[in-house]
């Protein structure tokens, strides 16, 4: 059953997307896990990392969950849509993303036990 979400878990999320060539994806994933995910684990309510291997490139998506936009702004130093590029992102990514997407969560359905 879908229920309106009212702050029990999280209210907002930031979505970052980055693409690598397929031949670089296996090197980028552990780098992203080691350098990009820990700051989110420390500051956000939660974080997820996704990977989709396509024919010629791989897309990585990071979703981090936040109580509100102010918490995101505190993490980024002002603009909640600002990206924290990792030192080696330029080496790995097909193009450097300019912004993250910030969205408000309207419905949350969690798996049943």
Regions found by a protein language model. Name each.
Residues 19-30:
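Short, surface-exposed ligand-recognition loops at beta-strand->loop->(often short) alpha-helix junctions
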Residues 12-18, 48-80:
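Short, well-ordered beta-strand segments in beta-rich or mixed alpha/beta enzyme
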Residues 26-28, 57, 72-74, 110-112:
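Short acidic, gly/pro-rich beta-turn/loop elements at beta-sheet edges
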Residues 30, 34-46, 65-101:
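An amphipathic, aromatic/His-enriched active-site/gating alpha helix that lines ligand/cofactor pockets
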Residues 22, 68, 104-107:
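Non-catalytic surface loops within mature trypsin-like serine protease
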Residues 1-10, 45-61, 84-113:
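Glycine-rich beta-strand-turn "strand-cap" elements at beta-sheet edges
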């Amino acid at each position: 059953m879908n229920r309106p979400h009212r702050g029990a878990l999280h209210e907002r999320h930031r979505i970052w997307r980055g693409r690598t060539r397929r031949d670089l994806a296996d090197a980028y994933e552990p780098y992203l896990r080691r350098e990009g995910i820990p700051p989110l684990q420390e500051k956000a309510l939660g974080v997820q990392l996704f990977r989709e291997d396509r024919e010629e490139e791989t897309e990585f998506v990071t979703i981090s969950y936040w109580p509100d936009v102010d918490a995101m702004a505190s993490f980024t130093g002002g603009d909640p849509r600002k990206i924290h590029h990792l030192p080696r992102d330029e080496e790995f990514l097909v193009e450097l993303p300019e912004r993250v997407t910030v969205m408000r969560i309207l419905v949350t359905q969690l798996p049943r036990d």
